Design a protein with these regions (language model features):
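Active-site histidine-anchored catalytic micro-motif
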Residues: 1-162
Length: 164
């Protein structure tokens, strides 16, 4: 069975509503319990590396994410990064250029709805991300709105629709 590394960075997918809007709400281990079939794809290790609204991500955050992948690279067959949708495309692009000689899938995933909301896209997107991360594909990919695309070409078109 493949071994996948799940890096959580924040975003709507892992949030819950509060009186002041969305706030960090779930660790990757808690989300894994909410979508237990993800374990069918691979053995999954979870790392909660930051809890940021993706609109606040800076270049040093991309360096931190890339560094985490480089540090754990030999231990895993693929990587899934849960992320906010506002800058998901920028993170994909940064990782594409920062991770030289990449020979594994790195999948950056977001959702427009929190994982606990009814009719959420989060669970579908997580399944697509782990399927891609456990595949033989190589490169950085984006998953959002039920689509899997090469991360370098991802862009967010609309703030309120469930796609990238």
């Amino acid at each position: 069975m493949k071994k996948i590394c799940w890096l959580a960075t924040g975003g709507t997918i892992a949030s819950r509503p509060s009186e002041n809007g969305l706030v960090p709400g779930f660790t990757p281990k808690e989300m894994l319990e909410m979508v237990p079939n993800l374990k069918d794809y691979a053995h999954i290790d979870c790392y909660d590396i930051m809890q940021l609204d993706s609109t606040n991500l800076q270049p040093e955050d991309w360096q931190y994410i890339a560094g985490y992948i480089e540090k754990l690279y030999e231990q895993y067959d693929g990587f899934v990064i849960t992320h906010g949708t506002d800058t998901l495309n920028w993170t994909c692009c940064a990782l594409h250029y920062m991770l030289e000689n990449l020979a594994k899938p790195v999948v950056v995933i977001g959702s427009q709805l929190t994982i606990e909301e009814e009719n959420t896209d989060a669970k579908f997107n997580l399944n697509a991300a782990f399927a891609m991360a456990s595949s033989e594909k190589i490169g950085v990919f984006a998953v959002c709105g039920g689509q899997i695309i090469e991360g370098l070409w991802a862009k967010k078109l609309y703030l309120s629709l469930i796609h990238i």
